[in-house]
């Protein structure tokens, strides 16, 4: 007859109680490690501590990223009534302007995967801080462009340095959260993009009144003043963004053990073996990868178009000059409010 200890050690993952979780000791093989327990309350406290350190900072980073990539849409028509808008002063046609927008996405597609590789090798806090400072400086540089080739080249560089952020943040969350915990947190971060759209319109309206200050057109001030926060915030990210649970100084030894156990099955680790060719082939031949690709393509096409052309569309509806900038705020504000429905969808998917 099995002893209580033997029974406890034979408990499978399917038999876990809601208030008692199984824990694997750090450094041990998950198939052979002896099992210990931790309570649901301990786990909730750990997740809450992680949320407070990671989510607000990650959302703020993505907010600045999206603000800097989409503000060219505001600059295109800012002070167009006096011919001090970006398109008029750089003497670009509508077709050329569209090409300048397109090259951003080309660079974005090329550099996403390499950037994620570097994020793991160089540590998340260091790599993301570097990306932030770089895209902030490049955004400021857009304020100094005066020709179509210059705009196109700078936009390509912007796409190169922004490419790794969102997929990098999604990958970064796998170091800290179980699979079922990630969707609501990704949604929280992604929602900051719509908030950036609302703030972008309001900021463009305010900065539009700076036209001619120190001899610079308002659209140049727009790039300078919206790129600067990314550069400055990079220093905060360098020191404040935690890299991995096993190294975060704010976690106790007990909390690190719980974190290790939580992620033993479906989390990512700081150190792991390289992907084999067989694993790479299995991933690339999985139809679900391309299904997700098609879905995201369908979502991104209209979303990217709206983020870049909403000011132009609004102006075409008859709103005049700076008023067109202000009228881009309500749609994004409503969209941000609707993002609150994501937790409900997560609960429905579990039912």
Give the positions of each predicted feature.
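Central mid-sequence intracellular linker of multi-pass
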Residues: 2, 42, 48, 179-194, ...
């Amino acid at each position: 007859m099995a002893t209580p200890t033997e029974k406890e050690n034979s408990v499978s993952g399917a038999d876990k109680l809601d208030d008692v979780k199984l824990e694997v000791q750090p450094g041990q093989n998950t198939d052979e490690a002896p099992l210990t327990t931790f309570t649901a309350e301990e786990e909730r406290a750990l997740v809450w501590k992680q949320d407070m350190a990671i989510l607000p900072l990650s959302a703020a980073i993505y907010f600045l990223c999206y603000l800097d990539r989409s503000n060219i849409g505001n600059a295109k028509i800012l002070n167009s009534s006096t011919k001090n808008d970006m398109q008029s002063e750089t003497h670009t046609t509508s077709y050329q302007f569209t090409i300048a927008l397109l090259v951003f996405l080309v660079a974005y597609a090329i550099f996403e995967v390499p950037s994620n590789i570097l994020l793991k090798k160089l540590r998340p806090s260091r790599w993301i801080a570097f990306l932030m400072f770089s895209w902030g400086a490049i955004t400021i540089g857009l304020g100094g462009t005066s020709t179509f080739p210059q705009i196109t080249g700078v936009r390509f560089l912007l796409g190169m340095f922004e490419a790794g952020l969102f997929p990098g943040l999604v990958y970064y969350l796998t170091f800290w959260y179980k699979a079922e915990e990630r969707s609501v947190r990704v949604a929280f971060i992604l929602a900051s993009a719509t908030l950036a759209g609302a703030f972008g319109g309001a900021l463009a309206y305010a900065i539009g009144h700076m036209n001619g200050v120190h001899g610079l057109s308002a659209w140049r001030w727009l790039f300078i003043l919206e790129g600067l926060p990314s550069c400055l915030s990079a220093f905060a990210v360098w020191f404040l963004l935690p890299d991995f649970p096993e190294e975060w100084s704010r976690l106790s030894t007990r909390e690190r053990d719980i974190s290790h156990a939580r992620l033993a099955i479906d989390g990512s680790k700081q150190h792991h073996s390289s992907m084999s060719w067989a694993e790479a082939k299995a991933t690339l031949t999985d139809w679900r990868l391309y299904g997700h690709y098609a879905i995201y393509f369908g979502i991104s096409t209209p979303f990217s178009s709206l983020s870049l052309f909403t000011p132009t569309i609004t102006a075409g509806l008859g709103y005049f000059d700076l008023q067109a900038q202000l009228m881009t705020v309500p749609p994004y504000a409503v969209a941000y409010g609707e993002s609150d429905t994501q937790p409900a969808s997560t609960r429905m998917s579990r039912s």
